Structures are given as C-alpha cells and as structure tokens.
Amino acid sequence: EKLAALNEAKRVTKPGGYILVAYIMNEYSVITYAIKEKHIKEGIEGGMLDESFHCTEKANDLYSFVRLEDIEALNAQAALTREKIIAADGAANYIRPFLNALDEEEFDMFVQYHLSTCERADLMGASAHTVDILRVCGDSE
C-alpha cells in the first residue's frame, strides 16, 4: 500500500515537484507502547513484533510503523529523490510533561533545540513521526 501511494503521488506530481510523506516511526512505538506501557511480552508472543522488534502488520490495524531503512527502500522502489527528512517531533513526545511545565522562554529554547537536531540521523528513528521531503525528477534531471 505504501509503495502504491508513493507511485500515485509521483504520477500526479509535476516533474521537479515535491511530495511530503509523513511516517510513524517503529522505535517510538516499541519504546512507548511495548516497553513503557509493559506490552513487550504480549507483543512478541502475539506476533506484533518480530525478532528484531520491528512492528508487524498485526501491531495495529490503523497505523503502519516504519524504520528509516523501510523509508529508504520505498523511495528507491518508487524512484523518488530525497531532498530532506526531518523528525517532526523528536524528543517532544518522550518529555511532554516536562515541556508542559516550561515557561514561554524555556519552551522557545526547546523549539530552537528541536530545530537544531531535527535532521540528525542518529536521533531520527526515535522520533514518533518523520516527514520525508521528496522530489519527482523530471526528464532532464
């Protein structure tokens, strides 16, 4: 389904145009739901997580969880060029109660921190969401 959606987006986008794709990241789900909320055993026993802790289709009927390598494979299969990928929320979901307690100036500093780290590959996979900014190559590109 993901590849079909990317190919359809590519079909209706002009050459040189952009496609923005939002993803829910696998590791965020494992850390928050499976480990933090103590569903790890049932997740493994129920086949919701594979041996590498990748969420399977059984994990959720509504959402699909991906890793960076899944995103890169989809882009390659769809022959789309990445301009940039960013962590939409980074650490925010992990520290939400602390963020809610910040004053306005402190929160602005957190936003500055997030903007300075949202493209770091070493932090990307742990974000709850990513946005992949892709370009449709034209005939001359």
Ranges and model annotations:
Residues 1, 28-32, 91-95:
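Short catalytic/ligand-binding loop motif for oxyanion handling, primarily in non-cytosolic enzymes
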Residues 84-141:
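A C-terminal cap/extension of S-adenosyl-L-methionine-dependent methyltransferases
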Residues 3-5, 34-37, 100:
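Short, glycine/charged-enriched secondary-structure capping and boundary segments
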Residues 3-18:
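A short glycine-rich, Lys/Arg-flanked "PGG" loop and its adjoining helix->strand segment in the class I
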Residues 18-48:
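Conserved class I S-adenosyl-L-methionine
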Residues 40-63:
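C-terminal alpha-helical "lid/dimerization" subdomain adjacent to the S-adenosyl-L-methionine
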Residues 60-79, 85:
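Short alpha-helix
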Residues 20-23, 81-87:
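A structural signal for short, well-ordered beta-strand segments and their strand-loop junctions
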